[in-house]
Amino acid sequence: MKYAGFKENIKLSKLGLGAMRLPQTEPGLAKPVDEPKARELIDYCMAHGVNYYDTAYIYHGGKSETILGQALSGYPRDSYYVADKFNVQANPDYQFQFQDQLDRLGMEYIDFYLLHGITDLTAADYESCGCISYFQEQKKQGKIRHFGFSFHGTPDCLRRLLETYSWDFVQIQLNYYDWYQGTAKQQYEILREHDVPVMVMEPVHGGMLASLPEDCMELLPKGNGSPAAWALRFVMDLPGIAVVLSGMSDMEQVKENIITADSGQSLTGAELSQLARISEKLRKKIAVPCTGCRYCCDNCPQGLDIPSLLSAYNDYRDEAAALGDKNMAVWRLHRLKALEKEKQPAACMGCGSCTAHCPQGLDIPAYMQEMSALLQ
């Protein structure tokens, strides 16, 4: 296993296990975790050098933390690192949630603690509730070793957070699709500019880059692994990446990802060009080809942040396509429930002003209506 230096001589495995997609007893939304299989995956990861395990208060209906803690309980506490997250939407009582997490994990401290999924729209909730100063105090007391946040917002919001508070690390969505077609490259460069270690989530874009359409497969560089392996290699090759998380749900994924992380092979310029071409083909296939120009926002009587809403919709459609199950992908829209009601898709009046001003001619009210129905 390849390792990356963090702070204070800490060495983190380049591959981390994301405990959001643990094996289930049967396919489907909110089905029970297959605990024996989950433990088998974790044991295999530990045996092959993976030492970073990421969970959250809401994963697997609150069961992820307990299962992870039990699986790791047989190993020396200094042989692994656990990352956990405070979710203000799940329970704004941050003191209760933090203690509940320690109890679920069966641990006296959490190595890497994050504010969960900050966006431009939810940043104020985290900043105003008092949780930041509380968690900084927990760090002083040793109950948190490193404090950061996971992020799904704009580069401007990321820069503001970095310049306002002190963080030990930040976790962003980074993959070659978002690098070439989204804002991942900008976010990465901002973090490098501020000398903040980067933890990576969604290296295969919710599964989209692991299940490429045929015309994209033809462009994939020959040899050296599957589409998922190429996606992981792209991210692991970047300087300053501390950990690349993968939500692995079966042993085949675990074994392949460990082999990829062990290889440490750098991508050539020609290979990077091929991945860029694949990302462009995927962009043209994406459900809603919104470019984020915001002409729609300037003319929306409800003041909706339409590009952000459509971005959530695209995440939902991407995951649904990757999983082959729309119901299992609806969670991608759940972050919109954190918005004030007048900013949610249901607030759309259907006036059509957005479509009239959209250079792409998108039927935005139809997407708003679909999201509203899915969120009910």
Task: Write out the residue ranges for each language-model feature.
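N-terminal binding-site loop/beta-alpha segment at the start of enzyme catalytic domains
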Residues: 1-79, 140
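Structural preference for beta-strand elements that scaffold enzyme active sites
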Residues: 5, 12-16, 51-52, 79-83, ...
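Acidic (Asp/Glu)-rich catalytic clusters
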Residues: 7-11, 47, 69-79, 99-108, ...
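Active-site mouth loops of central-metabolism enzymes
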Residues: 21-36, 83-93, 123-124, 215-225
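Short, acidic/polar
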Residues: 31-45, 91-106, 152-161, 227-234
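Acidic-and-aromatic substrate-binding clefts and catalytic sites of carbohydrate-active enzymes
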Residues: 56-65, 87-94, 121-124, 155, ...
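Active-site groove signature of glycoside hydrolases
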Residues: 102-123
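Beta/alpha (TIM)-barrel catalytic core signal, keyed to glycine-rich beta->alpha loops juxtaposed to Asp/Glu
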Residues: 118-291, 295-304, 308-311, 318-333, ...
